[in-house]
């Protein structure tokens, strides 16, 4: 479809909902905002223009039609969680600038990369180590992990789009991508989608998920998947090359190019560790996670690892600020106007007789496998989280469990297609894995991942007293 067609369909969806009859329980301004919000989501999916532009269209339409005031429209930009992810994106630029991410990866490869399976685990450890401070898994996967995987593959004469792709490149690309979608489960600050979920949850239910609560829910399924998935993929989609003795020499060559560890790397590493400590101890220090992230950014600037020009040029952070602020603001207003509650009550009345826990399993599976219809995890969260979460809460599910459950379910669907998340096209686009194989292997991975995340996450929440 061309731009005009996609834009026309977006507007059409909004107009249809606008003029549909609705229950008197929903005020006219609430229904009109629902129409505009839905059209904005459709715009995110169809993308006649970039996501940020579609968000601005949503704000303008809502204010111009007197559905909300200008002050209400801009209220989402004052949300702390929105600024948390923006600050964390800026901080991740300091990690990339310093070269710390590359050094960690090549050090692990040099130490443990004697086989293709061990190489996969070394890459997994790299992603895990840097994920708490890189909330853009696209930047983490595409900017740090992918170039390393590509270099390793080519070093073993594994070329894309040819007979040598299966030597090692196909396996490493598949595994690195899978791990990138798993680390987002463990840390709240490892993915923008996580913070979108917690922001929407806070707006809808008035409950703020802490960094520590997220870690408690995600650590068990996340660690299990981190350990299992490289081996599982090794079994269902094995590389032709099993032993990689020359990987250590290649990694040493890259480390020689990087040279001795720099002051910038040392300072970023110290700041990184301190931020994690402050995030994980916020229950005692009472420091807001956003303040901690901003402290990290300022510390990087003071130590010279980051400049104001770097911050101004970090397009991902500013883009997230625009679209996420809009969504969080609109979603909160839909909750205040009673739209979400009416929808949740209607659906829950038709699910009489089903226990909320088993309903959560069914809705979780629906949420995960709806990813086939979305070109990003963010679009899926935006479209489905508020409604699905409200249904579960209306059926009796605890609010913290509900919010965290959808956080856990953000991961399994990201392996399903070659367009499931922002980072997916980078790994798929390398040309090592055919589309049909990507979908087939990705489905197998997602089934295992879904079961582990649901049951492991439930166990974690029970053990730590959340459930």
Question: PLM ranges: what are they?
Answer:
Residues 25-35, 79-90, 287-297, 347-359, ...:
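Structural signature of hydrophobic alpha-helical transmembrane segments
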Residues 23-31, 38-56, 73, 226-227, ...:
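Flexible hinge motifs at transmembrane-helix junctions and intramembrane kinks/re-entrant loops
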Residues 41-50, 126-136, 177-188, 278-284, ...:
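Transmembrane alpha-helix interface/packing and boundary motifs in multi-pass membrane proteins
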Residues 8-16, 38-42, 60, 64, ...:
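Generic alpha-helical transmembrane segments of integral inner-membrane proteins
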Residues 1-2, 24-32, 44, 71-80, ...:
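Interfacial loop-to-helix junctions that mark the boundaries of transmembrane helices
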Residues 22, 52-162, 314, 318-320, ...:
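Membrane-embedded alpha-helical segments and adjacent helix-loop junctions characteristic
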């Amino acid at each position: 479809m061309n731009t005009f067609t996609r834009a026309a369909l977006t507007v059409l969806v909004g107009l249809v909902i606008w003029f549909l009859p609705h229950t008197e329980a929903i005020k006219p301004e609430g229904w009109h905002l629902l129409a505009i919000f839905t059209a904005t989501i459709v715009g995110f999916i169809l993308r006649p223009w970039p996501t940020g532009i579609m968000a601005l269209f949503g704000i303008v339409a809502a204010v111009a039609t007197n559905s909300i005031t200008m002050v209400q429209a801009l209220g989402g930009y004052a949300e702390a969680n929105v600024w948390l992810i923006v600050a964390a994106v800026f901080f991740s630029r300091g990690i990339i600038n310093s070269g710390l991410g590359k050094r960690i990866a090549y050090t692990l490869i040099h130490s443990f990369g004697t086989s293709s399976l061990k190489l996969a685990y070394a890459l997994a450890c790299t992603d895990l180590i840097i994920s708490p401070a890189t909330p853009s898994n696209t930047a983490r996967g595409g900017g740090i992990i992918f170039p390393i995987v590509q270099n390793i593959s080519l070093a073993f004469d594994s070329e894309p789009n040819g007979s040598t792709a299966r030597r090692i490149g196909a396996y490493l690309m598949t595994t690195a991508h899978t791990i990138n979608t798993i680390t987002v489960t463990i840390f709240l600050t490892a993915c923008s989608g996580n913070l979108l979920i917690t922001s929407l949850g806070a707006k809808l239910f008035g409950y703020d998920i802490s960094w520590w609560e997220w870690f408690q829910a995600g650590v068990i399924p996340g660690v299990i998947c981190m350990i299992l998935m490289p081996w599982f993929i090794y079994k269902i989609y094995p590389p032709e090359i099993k032993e990689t003795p020359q990987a250590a020499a290649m990694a040493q060559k890259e480390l020689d190019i990087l040279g001795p560890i720099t002051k910038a790397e040392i300072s970023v590493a110290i700041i990184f560790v301190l931020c994690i400590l402050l995030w994980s101890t916020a229950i005692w220090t009472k420091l807001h996670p956003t303040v901690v992230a901003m402290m990290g950014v300022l510390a990087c600037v003071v130590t010279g690892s980051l400049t104001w020009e770097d911050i101004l040029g970090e397009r991902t952070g500013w883009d997230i600020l625009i679209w996420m602020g809009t969504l969080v603001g609109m979603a909160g207003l839909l909750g205040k106007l009673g739209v979400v509650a009416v929808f949740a009550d209607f659906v829950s009345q038709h699910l009489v007789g089903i226990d909320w826990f088993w309903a959560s399993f069914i809705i979780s599976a629906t949420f995960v496998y709806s990813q086939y219809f979305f070109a990003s995890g963010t679009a899926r969260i935006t479209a489905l989280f508020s409604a699905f979460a409200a249904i579960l809460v209306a059926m009796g599910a605890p609010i913290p469990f509900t919010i965290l459950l959808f956080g856990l379910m953000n991961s399994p669907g990201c392996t399903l297609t070659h367009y499931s998340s922002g980072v997916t096209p980078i790994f798929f686009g390398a040309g090592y894995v055919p589309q049909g194989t990507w979908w087939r292997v990705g489905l197998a991975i997602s089934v295992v991942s879904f079961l582990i995340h649901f049951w492991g996450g439930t166990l974690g929440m029970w053990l730590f007293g959340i459930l």
